[in-house]
Amino acid sequence: MTSLLAAEVAKRRTFAIISHPDAGKTTITEKVLLFGQAIQTAGTVKGRGSNQHAKSDWMEMEKQRGISITTSVMQFPYHDCLVNLLDTPGHEDFSEDTYRTLTAVDCCLMVIDAAKGVEDRTRKLMEVTRLRDTPILTFMNKLDRDIRDPMELLDEVENELKIGCAPITWPIGCGKLFKGVYHLYKDETYLYQSGKGHTIQEVRIVKGLNNPDLDAAVGEDLAQQLRDELELVKGASNEFDKELFLAGEITPVFFGTALGNFGVDHMLDGLVEWAPAPMPRQTDTRTVEASEDKFTGFVFKIQANMDPKHRDRVAFMRVVSGKYEKGMKLRQVRTAKDVVISDALTFMAGDRSHVEEAYPGDILGLHNHGTIQIGDTFTQGEMMKFTGIPNFAPELFRRIRLKDPLKQKQLLKGLVQLSEEGAVQVFRPISNNDLIVGAVGVLQFDVVVARLKSEYNVEAVYESVNVATARWVECADAKKFEEFKRKNESQLALDGGDNLAYIATSMVNLRLAQERYPDVQFHQTREH
């Protein structure tokens, strides 16, 4: 390994933000970029009525709904590091891409609305990070509002998400009385001054917990309350331990308000100091270290129509090892074909720029006219496939029906291509000619209907179907599997890649099937 490669690897940090809708993820994303000086006027995410669209809104439908469906990638410098932030759609309208993006990062930032605590979507996303024990940092947001008791919030995270909390900063007051935060490890208090939009206020720092200046700055009552709470915190919570953090067992917790531009930098300081540089990854034959000289990478997401003027698709590839250089020849392992990549892109939400070189942890965009699939591995010749980029069992299902029955062939072609791209999953029941599509977020269905029309000239509508969940099935005992298939034919379907799946009408129905056929494995995820 060259020393240049080692230095580039060491300074990269690649992370994503997980949160429930409206916990402030979009604001945090902007403020993170602001502190990294990537967006000069943060606050480009405006109310639904305004025409100044957020930096990461591409497709028409996003513009209509004021949400970011697309998982964009933003790179910015911070201190001596280069940080890659992968945006994860956070609205009710999120998709399987959100889950898969979490497989491409080395660390996650969990944003929690401190007035509400742990919410449903956060739980789901945390489950996905558990597949790889991804390290988690936590930001308790909206301290400029009235929040729940901070100790209660920590307890809730520990009990519900099964991860220990190690507070790094601690709030002084909240809402109208919010005065700032105390840093437990630096023994410093940062006094809150609201910075709105893109002004970052100079923050006044008071050294020492027992400094009389602290009482003068925040008032004696709040200063005493802080000292009392810290006694309790030190007794009741975890100390920060980097090893446990890297193992995904404890999360450092920061308090602040993204809207007020306060506290985000404390979290970023923690991120660049503690989060891992690009990590090794498993393939089906061996482990690949980031420091290896030979280039490797995998595709975790494909996005259609990022440029309204061009009907192209862009495949997002995470660089795992080596160095990408413009014009290099790479092998697409699935097809065993060599391709010259001369026009890879990097992204600063919405603006594409062509890249000359990229290192482990970076995300490249590859132009793709339907030849790249999710989970594809690219190498400099070695035949191996990265694992851990799964399909997730859909949670919502619809039947797709054609307005013109003669277009069945185009419909099937379109749906299979969209499923290879990860836009939706398609299931073809064995016992009838229905086409069932499965998704993780409601918006995926609208996207599919819109794309079938614009890209495949197929007019389709979707309607409800009596399906609650799906599981991929396999069984080591061929005879028992045949019996299972014979007796459950009406509930079996093939997915877009011709893998067999069990389509359950209810969770009870699924549990009964699992009890009745203990030798059959019902999988919630499936490797690409």
Curated annotation (Swiss-Prot):
UniProt-annotated binding residues for GTP: 19-26, 87-91, 141-144
GO MF terms held by the record: GTP binding; GTPase activity; guanosine tetraphosphate binding; translation release factor activity, codon nonspecific; translation release factor activity, codon specific
InterPro entries per record: EF-G-like_DII, EFG_III/V, G_TR_CS, P-loop_NTPase, PrfC, RF3_C, RF3_dom_3_sf, RF3_GTP-bd
Cell compartments where the protein resides: Cytoplasm
Keywords: Cytoplasm, GTP-binding, Nucleotide-binding, Protein biosynthesis
Keyword Protein biosynthesis in annotation: yes
Occurrences of domain tr-type G (ranges): 10-279
GO annotation (BP), single: regulation of translational termination
Cellular component terms per the entry's GO annotation: cytosol
Record-linked Pfam families: EF-G_D2 (PF22042), GTP_EFTU (PF00009), RF3_C (PF16658)
Primary role: Increases the formation of ribosomal termination complexes and stimulates activities of RF-1 and RF-2. It binds guanine nucleotides and has strong preference for UGA stop codons. It may interact directly with the ribosome. The stimulation of RF-1 and RF-2 is significantly reduced by GTP and GDP, but not by GMP.
Family the entry assigns: Belongs to the TRAFAC class translation factor GTPase superfamily. Classic translation factor GTPase family. PrfC subfamily.
Protein name: Peptide chain release factor 3
Biological source species: Escherichia coli O1:K1 / APEC
Gene symbol of the encoding locus: prfC
